[in-house]
Amino acid sequence: EQEMTLFERRYPRFIKAKYLNSARKLGAKGIVFITDEISDKSWIEVEPMMKRGVYGVEGLNENIKEDIPVFWVKKENQNWLKGNPQITVNLQTETYKYPSVNIIGKIEGTDPKLKNEYVLLSGHQDHDGIRHPVKNDTIYNGADDNASTCVALLAMGRAYSKQPAKRSILFVIHGAEERGLLGSRWHSAHP
């Protein structure tokens, strides 16, 4: 048994990654997060992420790894865990194509040998946009995630087009980053 405090929307995923292998080795059949006051407050941010499912770049060919389940139990409900609790889980799966593109630009280098080497500059162009209300605000403001990088890449592209480097520059603005780095995973697998 290990106690931990979850105090941010990303920490359930971090804690799972940190302790999942140890739990497997110890023969765990599941992981139960018992919230504290701080992680209770993050539930409104965490719940949509827990419901969104798994995205893969290979579509129907994607192998979804079977894993031990993870449950989130609010502290006030932890008495339910005493004795011999049982739970029934109904799992639904669906497959669909997620529309997305990678935007790629190249400025060829000036050096006859070095132009075959590439400097990769990248970011992503998607954003979640709207979420469940948090303090009556439903907008995910995306200036830094990731509009500022797109603007920076465009500015660098303009600068390099006027004064090319010795090496070629590859500009990639990935799609579907918010769905699990799909655009960058696709580009890495299919350069």
What does each of the following model-derived ranges do?
Residues 2-6, 41-46, 115-118, 130-135, ...:
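Short, solvent-exposed loop/turn and secondary-structure capping segments
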Residues 13-21, 25-26, 90, 101-107, ...:
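Short alpha-helical segments and helix-capping/turn motifs at coil-helix boundaries
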Residues 56-142, 158, 162, 166:
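Soluble metallo-hydrolase cores and metallopeptidase-like ectodomains found primarily
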Residues 24-29, 33-36, 83, 155-165, ...:
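Sec-exported extracytoplasmic/periplasmic mature domains
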Residues 34, 122-124, 172-175:
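Generic beta-strand/beta-sheet core signal
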Residues 15, 99-102, 129, 135-191:
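Acidic/histidine-rich catalytic neighborhood of metal-dependent amide-processing enzymes
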Residues 1-60:
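Extracellular/luminal Protease-associated
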